[in-house]
Amino acid sequence: MSPNVKKLRRSTLFWRRAAAVLISATTALAVSCMTSRTVDASPQPGARVTATVDGLKLDGQDWWPTGFNAYQLATNWSVNWGCGAMVDLDDYFGSLPPKSLTRFNLFQALAINRFTGEMDFGPMDAVFAAAEANNQMILPVLSPQDGACEDETFKERSWYVDGWTEYDVTAERALMSFQDWMEVAVARWKDSPALAAWELVGEPEPSLCTDAACNWWTRECPTDTAQILRSFYEAAGAELRAIDPKNLITAGLLGGGQCGTGGDDYQYVSESPYVDVVQYHDYGADGVPLPGDQWNGLARRIDQAEAAGKPLLVAEIGEWAGSCESLEDRASHISDKIEGQKLAGTAGALLWAFVPDPRPQECTMDIGKGDPLYGVVAAEAVWG
């Protein structure tokens, strides 16, 4: 690339970012004023969903939510780069039992029009509108740990220190820092009656990459990663709560002993006053309600969540099926798993993952419309 082209690209990106920043200027000023004083860490009254150590409530009634991860809901190929196939939003939300919970990607990259380079909230607004119209609840994830459907870059330790506040002018699929995106997103959708909680990062892990592929078996885990991760939740959480004092914040912890949350560190991070709900993600133990060992297993995480005074949502449960296992057997295994987890004290269960184009002739975790797991979701949900 010639120096002139590089210079032009930098200039174009600068003005794009300047235009994007105008969207959040009022919000940023308000946040600056609010965070100059101490922000109350506890959610204020008024949200539809509330949390205690005993679980979740929706509209004041006990709520043990079930539902799906449907990461691609904001995909619209006529606007953004997408993340999976496009979904008929009314058809999807209309197919669920009322007051189900859906976790989906609300990444900055999906708010950028790939043709104009400008912010375009249309596809995301459509998700909230469809959820509201169909009496459903949603859990938006603001950014992924691994960069999938975003910049494809693994978030290392430095990102959690201060990288989340910095804008990378070379990034094709970003017009602002994560900090700015969080402020824009929260200000825009905080009053939606479909909003259950905010999730800052899916499966956070502030480790260090030692090779270009950042393979998990070669990553390094500095001794201060738990402190770094908790500090991130307290800094970002305070800014989020300054904009939205009512709605819950959930930490999207994988829970299996990852860097920063292994062993006792899981409880330390969970005890942040800006974390209201903790998570566990369950894979590879088909039909086993409480997988894992005495240090990082789900039983240990439930105990730690209780000690921290937080409910624990099993936000991902995945099992392979299709060519390798019947859909009916998978549904039976997951039903048994959820029953056992509910008895052990979890606060809800979300399955991985709904797709509009399932591949029944392959071995996948796809869940399409009409899958027997829809019956499990309906049977296991509790409200009232």
Task: List the predicted regions and their residue ranges.
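Short acidic/histidine-rich active-site segments
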Residues: 314-316
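Short acidic, glycine/proline-enriched helix-loop-strand junctions
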Residues: 360-376, 380-383
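His/Asp/Glu-enriched short active-site or ligand-binding loop at hydrolase and phosphoryl-transfer sites
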Residues: 281-285
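N-terminal export and membrane-targeting signals
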Residues: 2-24
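A beta-strand-loop signature enriched in Asp, Gly, Thr, and Trp
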Residues: 290-298
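Active-site mouth of glycoside hydrolases
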Residues: 46-275, 286-289, 308-309, 321, ...
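C-terminal region of N-terminal signal peptides and the immediate post-cleavage residues
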Residues: 29-45
